[in-house]
Amino acid sequence: MGDNYNSESIQILEGLEAIRKRPGMYIGATNARGLHHLVWEIVDNSIDEVLANFANKIKIILNKDESITVIDNGRGIPIEIHPKTKVSTLETVFTILHAGGKFDSNTYKISGGLHGVGASVVNALSKYLKVEVRKNNKKYVMEFHNGGQILTPIKEVGSTSETGTTVTFLPDEKIFKETTIFSFSTIQNRIKQLVFLNKGLEISLVDLREEDEEKTVLYQFNNGIKDYVLELNKTIGTPLNDVFYVEGIEDNIVVEFGLQYNDNYSENIFSFCNNINTHEGGTHEEGARLAIVREINNYFKNQINKNNKGNEDKFTWDDIKEGMTIIISIRHPEPQYEGQTNQKLLNSEVKKIVSNIVGKGLSSYLLENPEDAKKIIEKISLSLKATIVAQRAKEITRRKIVMDSFSLPGKLSDCETKDAKIAELYIVEGDSAGGSAKSGRNRKFQAILPLRGKILNVEKAKQIKIFENNEINSIITALGAGIKDNFNDKKLRYQKVIIMTDADVDGAHIRILLLTFFYRYMKDLIENGNIYIAQPPLYKVENSNQIRYVYSDNELELYKEELLKQNKNYTIQRYKGLGEMNPEQLWETTMDPERRLLLKVSVNNAFEANLICNELMGENVEPRKKFIRENAKYVKNLDV
């Protein structure tokens, strides 16, 4: 540093070096999420071939050496010399940022992904990458290593009657220091969604990493979004109508839409543009809402209430959406998104197009299916009545939220600071543990809210019951930010909301109930990274004058082996509840920011999160049993 600021101080990062220097700019992070982003980039390139109707099969292989292979039966990346770079087009695509067919409207009318950065970014962040191209009855191979350096130039290696591209890459552990291990379930969830969104597409996933068994899944849904709605509704409740499905095209914009009601109380709405999940909605969702409200009210006025005077709409969107499951997917040649994350669609013309296509389809569906229409109107009418009854409870809740700290819940032991950026709220299971937490905390920035027993299961409860529940009201009031559409993170009183429960079955159940509530009513808390799970120790190990707190069975076994080697005697205490620790121990092990372990709660796949919420917390028992059977093997600590 100092005064040596001259021309030599200015770095020019060339080629793929810039990507390796700042990987977060291209894949978000270098954790497990960023690692899997590499897979999505290569898969997205194959999906672009599917969208262009040149491919219908994709195969993903998790190899023994922890590399991954993506195979498609598309046209194959061009191998001719590129007129601008003077090297093969294949080399250009994998070594130059923003090089790709996505920028040429003649090559891809519609595409997803990061618009041409994918292949080069994956290459830059890989220890090794091999690409095989099959086209023109020939097979070509090119290899790279050490972050995109050419290992083997492009060469012809044989003949073939097939077409397509195969990419194998091994992530660089120098970049991905946290992990380079791909998750089978993460990839499985994503490809299942892609198959739903691309009618007729077949994707298989093969795991070769286990010595004794090969794990394989294959997905193909010929009804696309219709199957998607059915899959999602399977675990929620009893369907009230056959799936309403419509597809259409207007001004080169393709619209697919599916809707089904169930007897549950929460809505599930997922929207996509060019296979990208638009979590924050946008103009396609606005168009769908406009059409649904219009056509439901038109049907009610013209078919059910036609003898009564008055032409005003009876139902609002809030009345109509209860118990509704919707999937809307559009394909747009020039999508415009808000920000860099592609989470909200902005194209203004989409609203009218979606409204027209969905509106015409829904109008016909209601007229042609009077029994289904009757059930839908009855469901909406009940929702309207419940809304009126719940309004008073909701207003009480809202009034509580805007009150100052003197009106906060009586059992809340608030912190001294009013600075939300450093304040923490511990939601603690039980009064005894709450007492220890109150005594052991740092009063300056840590608040304690004890819960009496299990909170209400919001997945099954009617809205009126939710707003009347004391425990839920205490949480809403303490946080001060409101719920659902009225949620305002600027009013949030604590930066960290930490769930602290016992390490047993009841504690796990309370955590699930709380997470379900936050996901359904304060989703922004999870999406913004405000929710954490405390990790109290499972064991206290004493030997001589030394005490060590142990947080997992695996850690305990390793420590026991270490003590045995040193010929030391020891005693082990198993903590079954937070109340077994005195305030000093609770602070030292679970609450001290310098020593505690917190798990941040995040949602990578909203569709899968909804399925799990519905399976674990919904009315149907069988899906819950199935989930437990399939996931029991992953449980590390169980106290029954």
Curated annotation (Swiss-Prot):
Presence of the UniProt keyword Protein biosynthesis in the record: no
PROSITE patterns: TOPOISOMERASE_II (PS00177), TOPRIM (PS50880)
Catalytic activities: ATP-dependent breakage, passage and rejoining of double-stranded DNA
Molecular function in Gene Ontology: ATP binding; DNA binding; DNA negative supercoiling activity; metal ion binding
Top-level enzyme category: isomerase
Any one of the GO BP annotations: DNA topological change
Subcellular location: Cytoplasm
SMART domains reported for this sequence: HATPase_c, TOP2c
UniProt-annotated site: Interaction with DNA, residues: 454, 457
Pfam families in the record: DNA_gyraseB, DNA_gyraseB_C, HATPase_c, Toprim
Gene Ontology CC terms, in alphabetical order: chromosome; cytoplasm
Domain named Toprim: residues: 423-537
Family matches, as InterPro entries: DNA_gyrase_B_C, GyrB, HATPase_C_sf, Ribosomal_Su5_D2-typ_SF, Ribsml_uS5_D2-typ_fold_subgr, Topo_IIA, Topo_IIA-like_dom_sf, Topo_IIA_B
Chief location: cytoplasm
Entry's EC annotation: 5.6.2.2
Domain of life: Bacteria
Presence of keyword DNA-binding: yes
Binding site for Mg(2+) 2: 502, 504
PANTHER family referenced in this protein's UniProt entry, alphabetically: DNA GYRASE SUBUNIT B, MITOCHONDRIAL (PTHR45866:SF1), DNA GYRASE/TOPOISOMERASE SUBUNIT B (PTHR45866)
Function: A type II topoisomerase that negatively supercoils closed circular double-stranded (ds) DNA in an ATP-dependent manner to modulate DNA topology and maintain chromosomes in an underwound state. Negative supercoiling favors strand separation, and DNA replication, transcription, recombination and repair, all of which involve strand separation. Also able to catalyze the interconversion of other topological isomers of dsDNA rings, including catenanes and knotted rings. Type II topoisomerases break and join 2 DNA strands simultaneously in an ATP-dependent manner.
Family from the record: Belongs to the type II topoisomerase GyrB family.
Other observations noted: Few gyrases are as efficient as E.coli at forming negative supercoils. Not all organisms have 2 type II topoisomerases; in organisms with a single type II topoisomerase this enzyme also has to decatenate newly replicated chromosomes.
Stated name of the protein: DNA gyrase subunit B
Organism: Spiroplasma citri
